[in-house]
Amino acid sequence: MNAEIIAVGTELLLGQIANTNAQFLSEKLASIGINVYYHTVVGDNNKRLQKAIELAEERADMLIFTGGLGPTKDDLTKETIASTLDEELVYDEKALTSISDYFKRTGREFTENNKKQALVLNGSTVFANDHGMAPGMGLNTNGKVYILLPGPPKEMKPMYISYVEPFLCKFTTGENIYSRVLRFFGIGESQLEVKVQDLIDGQTNPTIAPLANDGEVTLRLTAKHHDADEAEKLIQHVEDLILERVGEFFYGYDQDFLHYKAIRLLKEKGLTLACAESLTGGLFGNQVTENAGVSSVFKGGVICYQNDVKQQILHVPEEVLRTDGAVSKQCARYLAENVKKLLKADIGISFTGVAGPDASEHKEPGTVFIGLVIKDEPAVVFSLNLSGSRQQIRERSTKYGFYHLFKKLEEI
């Protein structure tokens, strides 16, 4: 069975809010074997919504609507679908009582337009809204399945999980979709694709989908099977083939990002970290502190943007700054070594470079040096030549910092 998600709301078209509902629903539907082939966004306009419905009916078995179930005049999803299907709208007594009770509790007038929220398509299965007012509904008619859900994610998501997914499972073949994401760093998308292109071309179950994002590449392996263990075997077989070829660049699965991996290794090994940031201006430290309980391993950091701060606080020799410059291997080494000493940490890491858009110290944008020192070992400096916008260079430098930290910690 295939589905189309139709998000209703002019605010979506204007870019005032992001359509996070479509992402959530697509992922959930895929997990129960329903393929989403189209996402449509339409404003609060009866005629345009009607055209969107007619088009979706031509190409999808299931139409899933989000938004337009509220009390105002521009909330017209139910009315438009009722007109298109020639179905009557009737009051759902449970929803009507729930909405009425809410207004009584809050001492507000229960107006006719709020009463409208309890209207549902005649003959539909009603999905209770445990976090709002307007109920959702599902209707199987004329060979199509119509699902109507509220727009606010805080209402739609719990409604889907509690009521909608069990309803939808009646329409699936029992063949579910299982996915695993393999994460790679230090290899470009085109380089990785060349190494596994024959696997991508030859696989139908599981499929292999590459995606590049800010210096790293992911491969999503997706298998269909009615049995989870069999799907796991299908995915594992293809994963093994991939890692035989590009395993040196592999670092993790799914949402286990580099900064999570690096901090977890710090905790496991009982080591502490300090950072000195010039180029990245606190981005590295910010990502470090996204990890819960990181105070046990993160001593702190110094944002040393100007040269006098590098010299006075982190004791980079004036001669180094004068002859080699702040953007240099020598400066990166001193920053890493001295922030480690200053904050009494086991590990020091530093970032210096040119974010752009203009050159600095006769060095081009994207010139980056990352210093890393662990305990009493000699400092190591990694040189990078990155491309992209100012923000992309800073973010990618941060990611490279976590990558090199992670790889060094693996060796200990």
UniProtKB/Swiss-Prot annotation:
Xref: InterPro entries: CinA, CinA-like_C, CinA_C, CinA_KH, Competence-induced_CinA, MoaB/Mog-like_dom_sf, MoaB/Mog_dom
Annotated CDD domains: cinA
Coiled-coil region list: none
A family per Pfam: CinA
SMART domains: MoCF_biosynth (SM00852)
PANTHER family associated with the record: NICOTINAMIDE-NUCLEOTIDE AMIDOHYDROLASE PNCC, NMN AMIDOHYDROLASE-LIKE PROTEIN YFAY
Family indicated by similarity: Belongs to the CinA family.
Name of this protein: Putative competence-damage inducible protein
Native species: Bacillus mycoides (strain KBAB4) (Bacillus weihenstephanensis)
Organism ancestry: Bacteria, Bacillati, Bacillota, Bacilli, Bacillales
